[in-house]
Amino acid sequence: MLICHQCLSSRLTYISNLGLNIAYRLIEQFTDDSKLVIVVTSRTLPRVREVVDLIKTYAEKCGKSGAVDFDYLLVDFTDMVSVLGAAYELEKRYDAIHYFYANAAQGVYSGIDWLGATKAVLRDPLDAVTNPTYKIQRVGVKSRDGLGLVFQANVFGPYYLIRRIIPLLAKGKAKVVWLSSLMSDVKYLSLEDVELLRTDSSYEGSKRLVDLLHLATYKELKSLGIHQYVTHPGIFTSHSFYQYLNFFTYYGMLFLFYLARWLGSPWHNIQGYKGANAPIYVATLANPTFEHQALKYGSATYRDGMEYIAKHEIDPTGMHDAYKYIRDLAEEWDIKLKDQITIGRSLS
């Protein structure tokens, strides 16, 4: 167990841009006599404060305010110096981490192809709201580090942080949970464009990389006592596209989601709370002796909204090449950040 600055026996949960519903369900599931410390991360302090206030209110509602404590960490996964700084802060503050959620979901969207969306809905409404290929994504967007922005935010940044804090995760016998997507098909990733700079499906490609990265690393982590899983939340309403919807299109989307569920789609969870089912299941309920880590665990619902866990096989095509690229890139950044490491140590 972790001894934190409050001198209480604690379990530390590191939340990487984690959706509130996952935090809520984690609080509900936590029944240990020890204290749960939730580390909220964001790029900005106002967002951290907002999230902490919401989680505190929920903990009080559940009657667990005394069992939950909070810390925060400012980190930008599209800035490698920031990622390195986050690793050092965690090393300074804590002895162990018990849960790590890698939930980055950066996209470079610029709108919706309404003509394409209309045609898709008329042609096959169920497929249109399950595989929405009419979202417009910008091509070639780089971070200030010169890397593909979506690749760095969703894949490389979180991977690099995990890699730097392996000792903390090992001490806590941690559960590392990656959030992938229902739309992480093989077709969205070209091994000639691992940084996703030449594709108009960079978000989906990044989630395909998450699947492959998990397959390539979970066995090595398991040998260190760290159990890693990959999950997806199904389909639910989120704030990411509200700016492109008006009153009519929002409720039209909601109607189609419920219609899809009624027609038999297991993936239209609709509420974010239900979408959080699989990420919580693998962290708190799954038995690592029996659960297969090579599978993807998805949040699913029956027609009546009853929740269940659905398991997927993951196509390993390209796993070794993708992992080699990411691993080699991490080693390059070790060298680039060498001076930052020296500076960080001299100031600590």
Curated annotation (Swiss-Prot):
Belongs to the short-chain dehydrogenases/reductases (SDR) family. ERG27 subfamily. NADP(+) binds at residues 18, 37, 41, 47, 163, 203, 207, 238. Keywords: Lipid biosynthesis, Lipid metabolism, NADP, Oxidoreductase, Steroid biosynthesis. Pathway: Steroid biosynthesis; zymosterol biosynthesis; zymosterol from lanosterol: step 5/6. One of its GO terms (biological process) is ergosterol biosynthetic process. GO terms for cellular component: endoplasmic reticulum membrane; lipid droplet. The keyword NADP applies. It comes from Eremothecium gossypii (strain ATCC 10895 / CBS 109.51 / FGSC 9923 / NRRL Y-1056) (Yeast). One of its GO terms (molecular function) is 3-beta-hydroxysteroid 3-dehydrogenase (NADP+) activity. It is an enzyme of class 1 (oxidoreductase). The gene is ERG27. The lineage of its organism: Eukaryota, Fungi, Dikarya, Ascomycota, Saccharomycotina. This is 3-keto-steroid reductase. The active site is at 180 (proton donor), 203 (proton donor), 207 (lowers pka of active site tyr). It catalyses: a 3beta-hydroxysteroid + NADP(+) = a 3-oxosteroid + NADPH + H(+). Its EC number is 1.1.1.270.
